[in-house]
Amino acid sequence: MAPSSLFLSVGSLIASSLVSATALEARQSQTYQLAESWQGESFINDWNFFDRADPTNGYVTYVNQSFAEQSGLVKVTQSGSFYMGVDYESTLNPNGPGRESVRIETKNYYTEGLYVIDIEHMPGSICGTWPAFWSVGKDWPNDGEIDIIEGVNLQKANKIVLHTSGSCDVSGSNDMTGTLSSSECGEASGTVGCVVKGTNGSSGDPFNEAGGGVYAMEWTDTFIKIWFFPRSQIPASLSSGNPDTSSFGTPMAHLQGSCDFAERFKAQKFIIDTTFCGDWAGNVFAESTCPMSDPSSPMQSCVNYVAQNPAAFKEAYWEINSIKVYQYGVSAASSAAVSQATASKVEGTLVSVQAANTATPTVPVPAETTAVPQPAQTNTVATSAADYATQSSAETTTVPAATGAPSVSAAEGGDSELESTSTVYVTSTTTICPVAESSSAAAAGGKKDAPFNGVSGAEVAATSVAAAPAAATSEHPGADAIANSAAATSTVAKSEGVASQLTAGALSEIPTAPPEPVSQAVSTGSFDDSDTAQGDSEEHGSIASASAAPSTIPVPASSSAAALGGSSIASSFASSRLVPRPTGSSTAASVTAIATWSPTAGERASGTAKGSATLTAPSEVVFTPGLSNGANRMSVGLSGLIGVMFIAALA
């Protein structure tokens, strides 16, 4: 090797050593800062209540927060501590649901740091119980599990257990007061995990008789240490809120070895629970001198005991003064800000769709929007029960001429099931309810993808009123039409002659051929939940979208009877549009209109059908939202019946 290369290698090695030493010294010079803490009411408000089946197959019924509070299973004591107990009054059927209990979990996941739990009382040494304070990653066992406090039945010494995937050995010569009974944490050699049996008095009845105590866990990328301090032996640095682990003394568990802790133990959520029997307590029930009602089955004996002896579980409760999370160089304020920004769950998000006067508008969806200013001439979907109950007919009137780029705002309020439905029945000679010159579809031969209020295409399908039917349907990328009676964009089949465009209140040109009824069905767009835009798993708030999935529904046949003296032929069509709901689904509302064509006297004499047609926008709404669907259908039915009788009489 050349001298220069040798010098370079030695220099690199020295530099690397200096950097490592500097980093270690910097870390050692740091002190733990309080990042997060819980006490009293915050356990109820800031932790999740788990109310599903027990993953450990226990004879237990985990209850939700509301039930737990009402039944007194969780509460804040007069001293300000958090109480979490079990039902100790009900005698149960061993073949029925298990004993009611509580399991709570942190809402966020946590990594390396110092975790301190001050416990006044833990579930006592009782046959059939399995209490635990533990943590687990999102992907078990790959992300690891840390059982900080765990015991079953009559045990009086805590058991500390680590679980992870693959092979993770901690058989190093580590100084600890507990006893290492298994050094393999990985699932490659079974599900036992690496186990440290704590000292007597660290769990159950002796722990409670001594007035409780404090457990502290220091978790780094190279080791996990756990200390137990009886109430009378809590270090001064812990009591002062400035923990110094170097003064803690010998830990009860020191787990370190060839295992890569940074790789094997990822972010964890913390859990406090009390279950009964199950995979551990039930299977070792006979080993604890607990009563065996069924000598052939420790599990059944455990279930029988738990079901038939409610008073035995009065002391099976947790009373926790506090849990505190400390991290190097992280203050409580900055940690709270980071937690709020990265791990909090958004319960409701206001989403705005800004629309431009183009056929293909963009649909920005800002994350966690809390307020959206509304420009002039904006229709807004109400999101509260009160708003839906008090909608006025102003929301369903004909559309005024728009002068700017209007917007459609849709607010989603979590799991609300409220629904806004707008239905319009027009008895005048109206075919289409226009929006504006810049955003209306052509009445005859116009662009089928013209935007509705700037949002491309309300879901529309029209019955053909010409000899060559051409029903058109267009899709929209974001929000659908809101509950506005005249704000539906419709496309009518092209007729012979010059195409006509319907604007805000006038028809620019008149078709040169009469419409002829050729169909008795109308297609409507149906909403597909799969098309709804979704947020991520931790944030809600999305814009409901729908694609056209036409289905056919019958409509009355077009009347061929002459109206007003038999001089015209009337043909009807219905257009459907989807109205968004806060839940992300939509319902279809129909807009029915009559197109009337009147030939001249000369045309009638010659048999040549060349007359003129008139299309006018409706001037008012017959009925508005707020009526039940049944009332709406009744109004449509009566109006339609009167119209048919009138036409028949004239004929």
UniProtKB/Swiss-Prot annotation:
As for subcellular location, the record says: Cell membrane
Kindly list every residue the record annotates as glycosylated: N64, N200
Q: Which stretches of the sequence are propeptide?
A: 630-651
Question: Does the UniProt entry include the keyword Signal?
Answer: yes
Q: Which SUPFAM superfamilies would you find in this protein's record? A: Concanavalin A-like lectins/glucanases
| The protein's enzyme class | hydrolase
Q: Where is this region: Disordered?
A: 364-422, 508-557
Where is this chain compositionally biased, Low complexity type? 364-378, 542-557
The Polar residues compositionally biased stretches are 379-400, 520-535
Gene3D superfamilies the UniProt entry points to: 2.60.120.200
Drop me one GO molecular function for this one. endo-1,3(4)-beta-glucanase activity
Residues forming the GH16 domain are 36-289
User: Signal peptide location in the record?
Assistant: 1-21
- Give the highest taxon in the source lineage: Eukaryota
Q: Name one GO biological process term.
A: cellulose catabolic process
Q: Where is the lipid attached (GPI-anchor amidated asparagine)?
A: N629
| PANTHER family attached to this UniProt entry | ENDO-1,3(4)-BETA-GLUCANASE XGEA (PTHR10963:SF58), GLYCOSYL HYDROLASE-RELATED (PTHR10963)
Q: Which family does it belong to?
A: Belongs to the glycosyl hydrolase 16 family.
Its biological purpose: Mixed-linked glucanase involved in the degradation of complex natural cellulosic substrates.
Annotated protein name in UniProt:
Probable endo-1,3(4)-beta-glucanase NFIA_089530
User: Which organism does this record belong to?
Assistant: Neosartorya fischeri (strain ATCC 1020 / DSM 3700 / CBS 544.65 / FGSC A1164 / JCM 1740 / NRRL 181 / WB 181) (Aspergillus fischerianus)
Instruction: Give the taxonomic lineage as stored in the record.
Output: Eukaryota, Fungi, Dikarya, Ascomycota, Pezizomycotina
